Amino acid sequence: MEWRRAFSKKKLEEKVKNMDAKQATDYLLEKVDEQRNLENKLDKRLQNTRKKNKNKEKTRTWAEKYPPVDYYSPEFVENFMKDMRREEFEKSEERRGHKQVRLGSDNFVGDDPLKVLSEEALKAGFQHTGKVMKRFPADVFEKSKFIGMYDRHLTTLREKACCKKERNQIQSKLIQLRQLKPSCDFLAGTVSGVPGSGKSTLLKNVQKKLKNSVCLLANKELKGDFAGVPSVFSVEEMLLSAVPSSFNVMLVDEYTLTQSAEILLLQRKLGAKIVVLFGDREQGNTNKLTSPEWLHVPIVFSSDSSHRFGPETAKFCEDQGFSLEGRGGEDKIVKGDYEGEGEDTEVNLCFTEETKADLAEVQVEAFLVSSVQGRTFSSVSLFVRENDKPVFSDPHLRLVAITRHRKLLSIRADPEVWVSFMFATREGEEVDTHCYGEEHRPDEAE
C-alpha cells in the first residue's frame, strides 16, 4: 500500500548529516517505525471507511487523496538502504561468533574479496591495524601529476635505449600511458610484514580463493614459487601484454620493487576496483617519487613476527635498527674474511656488479641482493667490499641482504668493512620529491 511520508527529506538529511553511520541508522530506523505505525493507523481508518461506505470515490487510498509532498532523493534512499544492509550484515557476523574486520567503507563491508582477505590475513597471524582501505578517484593518475612525470621519464629512457627490443618495450608503455583513460574508482590497501612473516603464503591463499583477481609479481624470478596458483604474471609481463585483460582485484607481490606510476597504470589497464599491495615497507626506498609509498596507501594488516629465522637473526637485525621478532628454529650468523675459506652455503650474494665480477674471477658464482628480494634459502654467504658502501648504506637493501636465510648467514667481509656495514648510513642523501626517476630534465618539476 502507498502512504504519505510523515517526515521531510530535507529535515531528515539535515538531522543525520553530522552523525556517524550507526547513529544515523538508529535514528532513521526509529523514524521508519514511526512511519509504519502511522501507516497501520491509516490502513485501519481506510478499512473502517470501506465498511461504512462502498462508494469507490470515498474509499480511495490515503495516498491518492493526499499525494506525497516531498519525496526522498534516490541518493538518500540508496545510502539509507546500504546502512541497513551493513547493520544486518554485522549482526549476522556477531551471531556467528566473530566480529567482521572492516577494510572498506560502509559500501564495501561484506564484499567478497575484502572478506576473503580479512579472514585469510587473520588466519595467517597478521594483525588488523584499524585502518580501512583508501578510496582513490579514477583520475588519480592525472590529479597526482604522476602521469606527466612518468611520460617524460619513459620518453627519456626511450631516447637512451641501447637496443631495438628495449626501445619497443618502452614505446609500448608510452602508448598505453597516453591512450588508456580513467576506468573506475578503486580501493587500495597494503599488507605489510617483516621477512618470513608469511606474506607470500597469504597472497597465494587469497589468490586461490578469489574468482576474478590477478596476482602480479614485481620479481619475475619468483614465478616458479607460485606454480599452481591461477592468473599469476610478472608486472613487466602485464605491462607489455597486448591481450586485453580485466580483473576486479589486483594483488601485487613485493610491491616495493615496483614504481608508483606502474601501479596506477596497471590498475587503469585492468580496470581493477580493489588493489592490494603485499610487501615489507622497510624494504622500500621512499627518497624518490618512483616509490609506491608516495601513493600513501594505508597498511590494513601487518606482522612483525618472522617464522623464517630465529632469535639470533632477529637480534642482529635489531642491532641495525630493524624491529622484528624471530619465531623460527635455531639460526646462526657467522663472520669471516672476504678472502679465504668460509662456510659452505646454498647461495652467494653481493651488493654490486663489481663485487660479482671480482668473485667470478675465482670461480665463485654470486647473485645481486637486489635480484633475490622475496626469495629464501637455507644458508647464505654475503660478500661485502669497501667499494660496496654506497649500495649497502641503503638500509632497505641491507635488510633484504641479511634476511634471505633460514638457518645460516655467513657474512664475508674484511674487519674494516665490517664496522662500516654494521653502522652504515646514507650520508648526505636528500629526498627528491620533484622528479620521477633517476634522470630527469630541468623542466620536470610541476
UniProtKB/Swiss-Prot annotation:
Pfam families listed in its UniProt record: Viral_helicase1
EC number(s) reported in the record: 3.6.4.-
Keyword Transport carried by entry: yes
Residues that bind ATP: 193-200
Intracellular or extracellular location(s): Host cell junction, Host plasmodesma; Host nucleus; Host cytoplasm; Host nucleus, Host nucleolus
GO biological process: transport of virus in host, cell to cell
Domain (+)RNA virus helicase C-terminal: residue ranges: 304-444
Protein name, as recorded: Movement protein TGB1
Source species of the chain: Peanut clump virus (isolate 87/TGTA2) (PCV)
